[in-house]
Amino acid sequence: MVFKYLAIALSVTLQAAPPAHADTTLVAVAANFAGAADAISAAFHVDTGHIAQITTGSTGKLYAQITEGAPFEVLLAADTKTPEKLVAEGQAVAASRFTYAIGGLTLWSVDADLIGADAKVALLSDKVRFVAIANPDLAPYGVAAQEALTKLGLWDEVQPKIVLGQNIGQVFAMASAGAADAAFVATSALAGPDAPVSGSRLDVPQDLFTPLRQDAVLLNAGKDNAAAVAFLAFLKGDKAHDIIKSFGYDLAE
């Protein structure tokens, strides 16, 4: 009888344990998703035993690194075009591509009194000398900021105040440090456990910019790596979805 219960307990333990052989995968992540990616990576390791090593940057720079031979195995982009382009160029697995998050754009300042209900009043204020956005040539969130300013009829007036960050994470850092009086940041930067508790903000209406649908794709370098395949599968699951939503993103329907 003792042996029977011991066998059952051992069976349950083996079923619950991570795989005996854990692998590592190299994941390139758009800067806006850095915090969420770190949290997902930690949960992924607990669940599977695999390790996802996260490298962040602008989608444009990550694309350039991939095409130049960087050994990334998974890409979490800030747009849909870059994964699509990598598939078309034969550098990624077509069937693996999916939308993992939909981002938002927020005008934010560390000054609690600077930004009210009218973006025009804030951006044209004499108190605002510098407005930070991500470089539109490198970062989809920079494109979104430019689109929003153009649709609001403010691009020409605000352009002399604009300073560029190489990615949306750098833009948030500039605004946080006071190097920019206001900034168009990823809404996710103002959510999650490390979000600032002060400042003023105005969420940019979604109809002012092309939806920030963010696609993931398995790169050719990772198609034979169990950890890379498992990471993308985990990204589609409930645990990852809960983390993604906690950082202020929407999920694709």
Model-based region annotation:
Residues 22-56, 60-70, 77-80, 84-89, ...:
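Exported/periplasmic ABC-transporter solute-binding proteins
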Residues 4-16:
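Bacterial N-terminal signal peptides
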